[in-house]
Protein backbone atom coordinates (compact mmCIF):
# COMPACT_ATOMS: atom_id res chain seq x y z
CA UNK A 1 0.00 0.00 0.00
CA UNK A 2 1.15 3.50 -0.79
CA UNK A 3 1.10 5.98 2.09
CA UNK A 4 1.16 9.71 1.60
CA UNK A 5 3.24 11.64 4.08
CA UNK A 6 3.75 15.31 4.73
CA UNK A 7 2.84 18.07 2.34
CA UNK A 8 4.80 21.31 2.39
CA UNK A 9 4.56 24.47 0.35
CA UNK A 10 7.64 26.48 -0.59
CA UNK A 11 6.44 29.64 -2.29
CA UNK A 12 4.24 28.42 -5.11
CA UNK A 13 5.96 25.06 -5.24
CA UNK A 14 4.29 22.00 -3.79
CA UNK A 15 6.62 19.36 -2.41
CA UNK A 16 5.18 16.02 -1.38
CA UNK A 17 6.88 13.22 0.52
CA UNK A 18 5.60 9.84 -0.59
CA UNK A 19 6.50 6.89 1.62
CA UNK A 20 6.79 3.54 -0.11
CA UNK A 21 8.08 0.94 2.29
CA UNK A 22 11.21 2.47 3.81
CA UNK A 23 11.87 4.58 0.72
CA UNK A 24 10.79 8.22 0.84
CA UNK A 25 10.35 9.98 -2.49
CA UNK A 26 10.40 13.76 -2.63
CA UNK A 27 7.78 14.81 -5.17
CA UNK A 28 8.06 18.30 -6.61
CA UNK A 29 5.22 19.71 -8.69
CA UNK A 30 7.79 20.76 -11.29
CA UNK A 31 8.46 17.08 -12.00
CA UNK A 32 4.77 16.50 -12.66
CA UNK A 33 4.62 19.46 -15.02
CA UNK A 34 7.73 18.27 -16.83
CA UNK A 35 6.09 14.92 -17.49
CA UNK A 36 2.94 16.57 -18.80
CA UNK A 37 5.04 18.82 -21.02
CA UNK A 38 6.44 15.71 -22.72
CA UNK A 39 3.01 14.95 -24.17
CA UNK A 40 1.80 16.38 -27.45
CA UNK A 41 -0.57 19.36 -27.33
CA UNK A 42 -3.54 17.13 -28.03
CA UNK A 43 -2.53 14.54 -25.44
CA UNK A 44 -1.92 17.23 -22.83
CA UNK A 45 -5.26 18.82 -23.61
CA UNK A 46 -7.15 15.53 -23.32
CA UNK A 47 -5.36 14.67 -20.09
CA UNK A 48 -6.03 18.14 -18.70
CA UNK A 49 -9.72 17.97 -19.57
CA UNK A 50 -10.00 14.56 -17.94
CA UNK A 51 -8.30 15.66 -14.73
CA UNK A 52 -10.12 18.98 -14.57
CA UNK A 53 -13.49 17.38 -15.12
CA UNK A 54 -12.94 14.96 -12.27
CA UNK A 55 -11.87 17.87 -10.11
CA UNK A 56 -14.94 19.99 -10.90
CA UNK A 57 -17.22 18.60 -8.15
CA UNK A 58 -14.59 19.32 -5.50
CA UNK A 59 -13.97 22.81 -6.79
CA UNK A 60 -17.67 23.54 -7.11
CA UNK A 61 -18.31 22.53 -3.50
CA UNK A 62 -15.36 24.52 -2.23
CA UNK A 63 -16.49 27.66 -4.06
CA UNK A 64 -19.89 27.35 -2.42
CA UNK A 65 -18.63 26.61 1.08
CA UNK A 66 -15.67 28.98 1.17
CA UNK A 67 -16.69 31.99 -0.89
CA UNK A 68 -14.40 34.22 1.15
CA UNK A 69 -11.38 32.31 -0.18
CA UNK A 70 -12.33 30.92 -3.57
CA UNK A 71 -13.89 32.86 -6.42
CA UNK A 72 -16.94 31.13 -7.88
CA UNK A 73 -16.46 33.05 -11.13
CA UNK A 74 -13.27 31.04 -11.63
CA UNK A 75 -15.36 27.87 -11.60
CA UNK A 76 -17.69 29.31 -14.24
CA UNK A 77 -14.73 30.37 -16.36
CA UNK A 78 -13.24 26.91 -16.08
CA UNK A 79 -16.57 25.36 -17.06
CA UNK A 80 -16.69 27.49 -20.20
CA UNK A 81 -13.11 26.61 -21.10
CA UNK A 82 -13.86 22.96 -20.46
CA UNK A 83 -16.78 23.10 -22.89
CA UNK A 84 -14.48 24.53 -25.55
CA UNK A 85 -11.94 21.88 -24.73
CA UNK A 86 -14.38 19.01 -25.15
CA UNK A 87 -15.43 20.39 -28.53
CA UNK A 88 -11.78 20.57 -29.53
CA UNK A 89 -11.05 17.04 -28.36
CA UNK A 90 -14.17 15.45 -29.79
CA UNK A 91 -14.67 17.23 -33.11
CA UNK A 92 -11.20 18.44 -34.09
CA UNK A 93 -12.44 22.02 -33.96
CA UNK A 94 -9.48 24.36 -34.29
CA UNK A 95 -8.87 26.54 -31.25
CA UNK A 96 -6.47 29.45 -31.10
CA UNK A 97 -3.19 28.32 -29.53
CA UNK A 98 -3.40 30.91 -26.75
CA UNK A 99 -6.87 29.63 -25.85
CA UNK A 100 -5.61 26.07 -25.77
CA UNK A 101 -2.76 27.13 -23.49
CA UNK A 102 -5.23 28.84 -21.17
CA UNK A 103 -7.35 25.71 -21.03
CA UNK A 104 -4.32 23.62 -20.11
CA UNK A 105 -3.09 26.20 -17.61
CA UNK A 106 -6.46 26.45 -15.85
CA UNK A 107 -7.09 22.71 -15.93
CA UNK A 108 -3.70 21.52 -14.76
CA UNK A 109 -1.02 24.04 -13.92
CA UNK A 110 -3.17 26.45 -11.90
CA UNK A 111 -5.59 24.14 -10.12
CA UNK A 112 -3.74 20.85 -9.63
CA UNK A 113 -1.42 22.14 -6.84
CA UNK A 114 -4.52 23.19 -4.88
CA UNK A 115 -6.32 19.87 -5.21
CA UNK A 116 -5.00 18.27 -2.05
CA UNK A 117 -5.99 21.33 -0.03
CA UNK A 118 -9.40 21.35 -1.71
CA UNK A 119 -9.91 17.64 -1.17
CA UNK A 120 -8.89 17.91 2.48
CA UNK A 121 -11.34 20.76 3.06
CA UNK A 122 -14.19 18.90 1.40
CA UNK A 123 -13.26 15.77 3.31
CA UNK A 124 -13.38 17.65 6.61
CA UNK A 125 -16.81 18.99 5.75
CA UNK A 126 -18.23 15.73 4.49
CA UNK A 127 -16.27 13.42 6.81
CA UNK A 128 -15.61 11.21 3.83
CA UNK A 129 -12.47 10.23 1.92
CA UNK A 130 -11.56 13.13 -0.38
CA UNK A 131 -11.88 11.15 -3.58
CA UNK A 132 -15.40 9.89 -2.94
CA UNK A 133 -16.65 13.11 -4.52
CA UNK A 134 -14.37 13.18 -7.56
CA UNK A 135 -13.39 9.68 -8.64
CA UNK A 136 -16.38 8.15 -6.88
CA UNK A 137 -18.62 10.41 -8.93
CA UNK A 138 -16.84 9.37 -12.10
CA UNK A 139 -17.38 5.72 -11.23
CA UNK A 140 -21.04 6.17 -10.27
CA UNK A 141 -21.90 8.04 -13.46
CA UNK A 142 -19.76 6.10 -15.92
CA UNK A 143 -19.34 2.72 -14.18
CA UNK A 144 -15.66 3.00 -15.00
CA UNK A 145 -13.72 0.66 -12.73
CA UNK A 146 -10.47 2.42 -13.68
CA UNK A 147 -11.63 5.39 -11.64
CA UNK A 148 -11.69 3.17 -8.56
CA UNK A 149 -8.20 1.91 -9.36
CA UNK A 150 -6.94 5.50 -9.20
CA UNK A 151 -8.47 6.06 -5.76
CA UNK A 152 -6.24 6.63 -2.77
CA UNK A 153 -6.29 9.23 -0.01
CA UNK A 154 -5.59 12.20 -2.28
CA UNK A 155 -6.82 13.44 -5.67
CA UNK A 156 -4.94 12.89 -8.93
CA UNK A 157 -3.16 9.88 -7.52
CA UNK A 158 -2.47 8.84 -11.11
CA UNK A 159 0.21 11.57 -11.26
CA UNK A 160 2.05 9.82 -8.46
CA UNK A 161 1.48 6.38 -9.91
CA UNK A 162 3.07 7.69 -13.09
CA UNK A 163 5.99 9.05 -11.10
CA UNK A 164 6.64 5.93 -9.07
CA UNK A 165 6.12 3.47 -11.91
CA UNK A 166 8.11 5.18 -14.62
CA UNK A 167 7.97 2.20 -16.95
CA UNK A 168 4.17 2.34 -16.95
CA UNK A 169 3.85 6.10 -17.33
CA UNK A 170 3.17 6.17 -21.08
CA UNK A 171 0.72 3.30 -20.78
CA UNK A 172 -1.21 5.02 -17.99
CA UNK A 173 -1.41 8.25 -19.97
CA UNK A 174 -2.50 6.36 -23.08
CA UNK A 175 -5.22 4.54 -21.14
CA UNK A 176 -6.40 7.81 -19.62
CA UNK A 177 -6.63 9.42 -23.04
CA UNK A 178 -8.53 6.46 -24.49
CA UNK A 179 -10.89 6.50 -21.51
CA UNK A 180 -11.59 10.17 -22.04
CA UNK A 181 -12.20 9.64 -25.76
CA UNK A 182 -14.75 6.95 -24.91
CA UNK A 183 -16.50 9.22 -22.42
CA UNK A 184 -16.65 11.99 -25.00
CA UNK A 185 -18.46 9.67 -27.38
CA UNK A 186 -21.00 8.67 -24.73
CA UNK A 187 -21.95 12.02 -23.26
CA UNK A 188 -21.92 15.43 -24.91
CA UNK A 189 -19.94 18.09 -23.07
CA UNK A 190 -22.86 20.30 -22.01
CA UNK A 191 -24.89 17.42 -20.62
CA UNK A 192 -21.87 16.04 -18.76
CA UNK A 193 -21.07 19.35 -17.11
CA UNK A 194 -24.71 19.90 -16.17
CA UNK A 195 -24.76 16.42 -14.64
CA UNK A 196 -21.75 17.35 -12.51
CA UNK A 197 -23.49 20.54 -11.36
CA UNK A 198 -26.68 18.62 -10.51
CA UNK A 199 -24.64 16.07 -8.61
CA UNK A 200 -23.10 18.78 -6.47
CA UNK A 201 -26.41 20.50 -5.82
CA UNK A 202 -28.01 17.22 -4.76
CA UNK A 203 -25.15 16.43 -2.40
CA UNK A 204 -24.65 19.91 -0.98
CA UNK A 205 -27.23 19.40 1.78
CA UNK A 206 -25.58 16.15 2.84
CA UNK A 207 -22.17 17.81 3.07
CA UNK A 208 -23.48 20.75 5.10
CA UNK A 209 -25.48 18.49 7.40
CA UNK A 210 -22.51 16.27 8.13
CA UNK A 211 -20.31 19.28 8.74
CA UNK A 212 -22.58 20.38 11.60
CA UNK A 213 -22.60 17.00 13.30
Language-model regions: role of each:
Residues 146-213:
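Glycine-rich, aromatic-bearing surface loops/beta-hairpins
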Residues 21, 25-35, 39-175:
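Structured binding/interaction patches within domain cores
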Residues 7-16:
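Intrinsically disordered, low-complexity segments enriched in serine/threonine/proline/glycine
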